[in-house]
A protein has these predicted regions:
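Sec-dependent N-terminal signal peptides
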Residues: 3-13
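Subset of outer-membrane beta-barrel
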Residues: 17-359
Length: 359
């Protein structure tokens, strides 16, 4: 018995690899949290399980008559040459689904959509302002330390129903909300040049006519800017599905409303502090479109393909991290699955083998 429980725990864990750092927009987009769909080329519409239910696909949820309570948690580790190693452990989703009639399912849940959890970025090298550009008439050295934390979450309601023998549909409505803090510490120093490296904080050295000059930082001053942003908005998505004996087609359209942002800036310099608050919102709506197809080769195997076109998330530009807007996304996903079914009554009914790729 212990062996079977151990195998269930091992096979229920999903592993994903991050290849970039989302220091723009509102942070990292939290994608698919279902390990089964991740293995199927990061699919949104298909999972390859025996019921062909995908957590992120409202038009498939009616296929189960059971009440389902789900919690997903994930750990991310990111190592780059530009920034310190980043470690993140967070709750990725929570949801409850239950039947409300024949072939009808209702559900609600909470999950993050964009997130930066304690992201720390520090300039490794000093930057310089020459005496001809400095307001003090003397050279200045400076560097920044940034701390970014928070993002946007969604509280969602969804409904799924089988409409006819071949057609089903689903709808999902989300309230978007969240807070994000960006702390910017700017350290500035007066720069003095000397032929001796002793005394003061050495920040650089220069060779001039075979003589070495050492740049030293003195009279350090820290200027701190705390930006607190409060987000609010909504989105709605509708999905339709057609399925017959061999083929399955899915189409999904999501509309994002205008995101409202309330920003509070607090500037602290030496012994003075100033605070200002303002509100603004995105000027346009945005939309996401997805199209999927699954072909059943045999009763226990099949292949799938999906195409997604996602518009940039609609936030005001001055509310984006480092004023860099999130990009739009276009992707294509391929997946395949094979089910090993157990004809005997026991501790397991089938073993699913999946593979996929996306770009």
């Amino acid at each position: 018995m212990k062996i079977y429980i151990f195998l269930i725990l091992i096979t229920g864990i999903g592993f994903s690899q991050a290849t970039g750092l989302s220091a723009y927009g509102v942070g990292e987009k939290i994608h698919n949290s279902d390990p089964a769909s991740l293995a199927l080329g990061n699919s949104s519409f298909f999972s390859g399980n025996s019921k062909h239910i995908s957590i992120d696909s409202p038009s498939s949820l009616w296929r189960s008559t059971l009440t389902r309570f789900s919690i997903h948690s994930g750990f991310n580790y990111l190592s780059t040459t530009q920034y310190p190693d980043q470690h993140q452990q967070n709750l990725t989703s929570f949801s409850i689904l239950f039947p409300v009639g024949i072939k009808k399912v209702f559900g609600f849940g909470l999950q993050p959509t964009y997130r930066s959890n304690k992201l720390n970025i520090t300039d490794e090298d000093f930057k310089f302002i020459g005496a001809d550009e400095s307001i003090t008439g003397a050279p200045i050295a400076y560097r920044n330390t940034y701390t970014i934390d928070g993002g946007i979450s969604e509280l969602f309601l969804l409904y799924s129903q089988k409409l006819t023998h071949n057609i089903s549909g689903g709808i999902k409505y989300s309230l978007l909300f969240g807070n994000q803090i960006l702390n910017d510490e700017l350290y500035t120093y007066d720069v003095e040049f000397d032929t001796s490296s002793s005394g003061g904080m050495l920040i650089n050295e220069f060779v001039d006519n075979e003589d070495t000059l050492y740049a030293k930082a003195n009279n350090g001053v820290m200027t701190e800017i705390n930006k607190h942003r409060k987000f609010s908005g909504s989105s709605i998505s509708a999905e339709g599905r057609y399925a017959d004996e061999k083929h399955e087609f899915v189409i999904n359209l999501m509309l994002n409303g205008k995101i409202n942002v309330e920003t509070t800036n607090q500037l602290t310099m030496v012994n003075s502090s100033t605070t200002n608050t303002f509100e603004n919102s995105a000027t346009n709506f945005s939309s996401n479109f997805g199209l999927g197809y699954r072909y059943k080769i045999l009763n226990n195997s099949g292949i799938s393909v999906e195409i997604h076109n996602k518009s940039p998330f609609n936030i005001p530009e001055n509310a984006a991290i480092f004023n860099i807007m999130p990009p739009g996304e276009k992707s294509i996903h391929f997946g395949s699955y094979y089910q090993i079914r157990n004809s005997k009554i026991g501790y397991w009914n089938n073993l699913n083998i999946r593979g996929g790729a996306y770009t």
